[in-house]
C-alpha cells in the first residue's frame, strides 16, 4: 500500500461542491509518471490550495471558491491512474491544463488540517504545498502522523 498527498485547486463557482469527483486524484498532461505507482487500496490526503487561477469559459472568466489552505479529506484509491481525454481547462492568462489522468477514490473522512499544522507534522517549516505535478508520496510514518492529527481536526 502507498500513501499520497494530492493538491487540488479550489472548485470553480460553476462546479458542484458535492461532485462525486471532487476528491479523486487528477494529474495534468505531462505529469502522469508521478502516478504510475497509484493502486487500489492506497490512501490519499486531499489538500486544497488557498487560491488558483480563474478559468476562461468562452469569453467569460469563472472565479473559484475561496480555498481552505488545508488538507480537507482522506480517501482510498479504488482504481489505478487511468487516461481519459478531456477538454483543456483554459486559465485566465491563456495557459491550458489537460487533466487527462485520474484515479477514482472513495472519501473516508472530511476534516480540516491547516497548512500550518501540516508543516509542523512534516517538520518542514517552509513547506508550501506547491507540490510539482500535484502529487507527493508520503512515508508510512508521515501518513500515520498526519492521520492522527487530521482525525482530530475540525469537521466541515
Regions found by a protein language model. Give the residues of each.
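Aromatic- and Lys/Arg-enriched surface recognition patch
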Residues: 65-141
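Short, Lys/Arg- and Gly-enriched loop/turn segments at beta-strand edges
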Residues: 51-73
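Extended aliphatic helical segments
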Residues: 7-13, 44, 57, 62, ...
Amino acid at each position: 500500500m502507498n500513501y499520497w498527498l494530492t493538491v487540488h485547486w479550489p472548485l470553480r463557482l460553476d462546479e458542484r461542491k458535492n461532485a462525486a469527483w471532487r476528491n479523486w486524484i487528477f494529474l495534468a498532461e505531462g505529469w502522469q509518471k508521478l502516478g504510475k505507482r497509484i493502486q487500489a487500496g492506497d490512501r490519499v490526503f486531499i489538500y486544497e490550495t488557498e487560491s488558483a487561477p480563474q478559468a476562461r469559459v468562452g469569453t467569460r472568466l469563472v472565479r473559484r471558491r475561496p480555498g481552505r489552505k488545508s488538507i480537507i479529506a482522506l480517501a482510498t484509491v479504488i482504481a489505478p491512474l487511468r487516461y481519459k481525454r478531456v477538454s483543456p481547462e483554459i486559465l485566465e492568462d491563456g495557459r491550458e491544463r489537460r487533466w487527462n489522468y485520474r484515479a477514482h477514490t472513495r472519501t473516508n473522512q472530511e476534516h480540516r488540517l491547516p497548512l500550518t499544522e501540516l508543516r509542523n507534522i512534516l517538520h518542514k517549516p517552509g513547506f508550501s504545498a506547491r507540490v510539482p505535478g500535484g502529487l507527493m508520496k508520503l512515508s508510512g510514518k508521515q501518513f500515520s502522523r498526519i492521520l492522527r492529527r487530521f482525525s482530530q481536526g475540525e469537521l466541515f
